């Protein structure tokens, strides 16, 4: 088909993306996008069919504020089938942060990976993660199916709201965090007749908890320098847990492990988990999807 990397107007992009020809040429159904980690090396793959070029940048930390303003490694990606750019890097990269420098529509944009599973503080940079190391104890047994609920009772929960109050009975360091769901026998002001948090959910008898967005969203500063609140309908990284709910937002594996612990705690209580996700918009115009494929 025609050259899809040339500069276009928004209307021309819309026409191109809507065409059957583009879909047939570039639709990609593989499951290897993002950073596929192994101890001996990591494969990076980015779907960006309209990009002229893509470069992989590796960093020692998740943000410039942590002393890693410049990448320690840059690698030109190879354009392969269906507009997928690929890089293979040897060695154990677990815990290394990365971005893509994408040249598309006449502009260069440094962006996080739309397919990343972990990220540094505020989602600025993606992180290579060994998902096995981020498993809480017993996670491998969490795949067992729960009994079917005859009459579903769904309770909506905001991770921060769930335990933020000082009278919640949750330890101070875990209030408003994923780990609050793992605390047992919590009650109001020490009065066991007034259960809170997980004890309250079990007392209610709910069968499902629908969690307001717990993917990485942009309207709350994860550093915690100031008190902020949002429902979370401002997505930045769809496959990365929100860092403000983690006890450590700077190291990407922590949010993954603690989010899993939350889900595990709910399952152990016999409660299914529903994720609330919004796909019709993102936090800002300069987002990981638009920076990758304008």
State where each predicted segment sits:
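The feature marks proteins involved in alpha-glucan
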Residues: 1-39, 67-71, 79-185
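Blade-loop segments of beta-propeller domains
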Residues: 76
């Amino acid at each position: 088909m025609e050259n899809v990397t040339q500069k276009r107007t928004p209307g021309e992009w819309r026409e191109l993306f809507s065409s059957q020809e583009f879909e047939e040429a570039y639709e990609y159904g593989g499951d290897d996008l993002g950073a596929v980690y192994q101890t001996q090396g990591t494969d990076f793959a980015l779907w960006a069919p309209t990009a002229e070029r893509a470069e992989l940048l590796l960093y020692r930390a998740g943000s410039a504020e942590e002393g890693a303003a410049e990448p320690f490694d840059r690698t030109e990606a190879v354009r392969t089938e269906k507009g997928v750019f690929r890089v293979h890097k040897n060695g154990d990269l677990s815990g290394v942060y990365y971005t893509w420098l994408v040249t598309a529509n006449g502009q260069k944009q440094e962006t996080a990976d739309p397919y990343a599973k972990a990220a540094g503080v505020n989602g600025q940079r993606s992180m290579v993660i060994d998902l096995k190391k981020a498993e809480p104890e017993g996670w491998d047994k969490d795949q067992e199916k729960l009994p079917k609920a005859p009459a579903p009772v769904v309770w909506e929960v905001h991770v921060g709201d769930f335990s933020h109050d000082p009278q919640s009975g949750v330890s101070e360091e875990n209030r408003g965090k994923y780990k609050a769901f793992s605390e047992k026998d919590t009650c109001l002001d020490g009065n066991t007749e007034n259960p809170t948090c997980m004890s309250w959910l079990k007392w209610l008898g709910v069968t499902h908890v629908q969690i307001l967005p717990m993917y990485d969203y942009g309207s709350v500063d994860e550093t915690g320098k100031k008190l902020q609140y949002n429902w979370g309908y401002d997505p930045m990284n769809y496959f990365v847990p929100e860092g403000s709910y983690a006890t450590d937002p700077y190291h990407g594996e922590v949010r993954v492990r603690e989010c899993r612990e939350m889900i595990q705690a709910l399952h152990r209580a016999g409660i299914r988990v529903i994720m609330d996700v919004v796909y019709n918009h993102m936090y800002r115009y300069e987002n990981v999807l638009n920076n990758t494929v304008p």
